[in-house]
Curated annotation (Swiss-Prot):
UniProt-recorded name of the protein: tRNA U34 carboxymethyltransferase
Keyword tRNA processing: yes
Organism (species): Trichodesmium erythraeum (strain IMS101)
Enzyme type, top EC level: transferase
Gene of this entry: cmoB
Function according to Swiss-Prot or TrEMBL: Catalyzes carboxymethyl transfer from carboxy-S-adenosyl-L-methionine (Cx-SAM) to 5-hydroxyuridine (ho5U) to form 5-carboxymethoxyuridine (cmo5U) at position 34 in tRNAs.
Residue numbers binding carboxy-S-adenosyl-L-methionine: K95, W109, K114, G134, V184, E185, Y204, R319
InterPro entries membership: CmoB, Mo5U34_MeTrfas-like, SAM-dependent_MTases_sf
Reaction catalysed by this enzyme: carboxy-S-adenosyl-L-methionine + 5-hydroxyuridine(34) in tRNA = 5-carboxymethoxyuridine(34) in tRNA + S-adenosyl-L-homocysteine + H(+)
Amino acid sequence: MLNKNIGYISPDYLYKYNSPINTEAILKIRQERQAKLFKFSHEKYYKAVQTIADIQSNFFDCSSAVIKVGHPEEISPGQKQRLYHCLQTFCPWKKGPFELFGVNIDAEWRSDWKWDRILPHISSIKNRKVADIGCHNGYFMFRMVDQQPELVIGFEPYSKHFWNFQLIQNIVKQKMLAFELLGVEHIHYYPQFFDTIFCLGILYHHTDPIGLLRKMRQALGPKGEVIIDCQGIPGDLPVALTPQKRYAQARGIWFLPTQSCLENWIGRAGFSDINCFFAAPLSVEEQRRTIWANIDSLPEFLDPHNPSLTVEGYPAPWRYYAIARK
């Protein structure tokens, strides 16, 4: 359905399912946060999306690395100029790649690499209810469409990311995709609702990773599956690094676990059948500066004389991917 201020919004799932979702709490937060979408500080984002409201296409391909929307010949030179300016408004693009009407967006992160690593290890999400926690601009949500889920709810509290998702959703109009301005701390409002939960790149940004994992477990139905991607450090001991202030120039990094530490977190949250299926140093090919993300990135975050260390002298980041069941 169309919302005159936002654009295309999928049918509200809250009224579809006979489940113990805390609808009252979700509606309250939704109302509060949707009002903030139009704050002066976010004006450039929603106005940018409005400038391309007339650009539409029936072509949407999410089956490969680059999410493709529209063909170049479907839009006029004037429309292409407006589209380009709209897309530039959302720089730096952190997740991708995308191609919109022939405009190639090479994002800072090769998110397709992550998806290609994960997909062979998960149970089918066909006809399943899925949560994507920290969905950002929706890259993984759009990739999931190809797997034919029943419903995908993206959890993302930041308004910029909402509008970034919306500029694409307004064109592709995928009914199974819902974007909520919620954080991982709200996942327990969906008790036993989801079949699969993706939590990619989130845990190390929070002060209570085990508590959040427990909330995710509450939100999973019987035999539900959680997929975790967590930044961490190398080592055999089940320990986590807590940086004094910054890690790889980033604030808001609280706990960086070793593989065994992450597995222990997941186990102590009550999950079983834990399988860490990927463990490797983060590479400067996977996270780097691009034209669409002209910002300092991993190459600048590492010690130029010793890339096994960050600029602060901590162990350089690893990525751990794990899957577990309720």
